[in-house]
């Protein structure tokens, strides 16, 4: 019998830093800008990608120095995970926290990001560069399937 993968054996708080980092599927959904209504605090999702996001690969161009380039970049940690209630339903951190398993397309399960892109989980098919946007309101999406 094969040993169960670490995400089926451990809680998020029990994971090593490397295990924690490996949970990220690299979909880029965190890297799309969100707009917040100042009156209602409702979050509006956009298809506008952070300048540091390589849209084709859905990876940060400067991951190690991302906070220097983008001070508003989020840092998802074990301590602040619950404050990011907008995380997509497909997010591994959210799934593991909710005691769900990773989907079959997740790179830790299938070994590649190809399935994630094919299933259109990543943002590569909808994202636009921040520098190309004139009116941000034109880029507000209806609440996507991946957002609850």
UniProtKB/Swiss-Prot annotation:
InterPro entries: Puta_zinc/iron-chelating_dom, UCP006173. This is UPF0260 protein PC1_1943. Pfam families: CxxCxxCC. Belongs to the UPF0260 family. It comes from the Bacteria. It comes from Pectobacterium carotovorum subsp. carotovorum (strain PC1).
């Amino acid at each position: 019998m094969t040993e169960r993968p670490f995400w089926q054996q451990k809680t998020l708080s029990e994971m090593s830093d490397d295990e924690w980092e490996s949970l990220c599927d690299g979909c880029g959904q965190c890297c799309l800008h969100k707009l917040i209504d100042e009156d209602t605090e409702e979050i509006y999702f956009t298809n506008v990608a952070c300048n540091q996001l390589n849209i084709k690969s859905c990876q940060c161009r400067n991951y190690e120095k991302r906070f220097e380039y983008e001070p508003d970049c989020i840092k998802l940690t074990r301590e602040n995970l619950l404050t990011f209630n907008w995380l997509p339903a497909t997010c591994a951190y959210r799934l593991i926290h909710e005691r769900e398993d990773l989907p079959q397309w997740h790179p830790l399960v299938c070994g590649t990001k190809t399935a994630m892109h094919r299933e259109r989980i990543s943002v590569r098919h909808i994202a636009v560069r921040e520098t190309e946007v004139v009116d941000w309101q034109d880029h507000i999406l209806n609440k996507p399937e991946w957002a609850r």
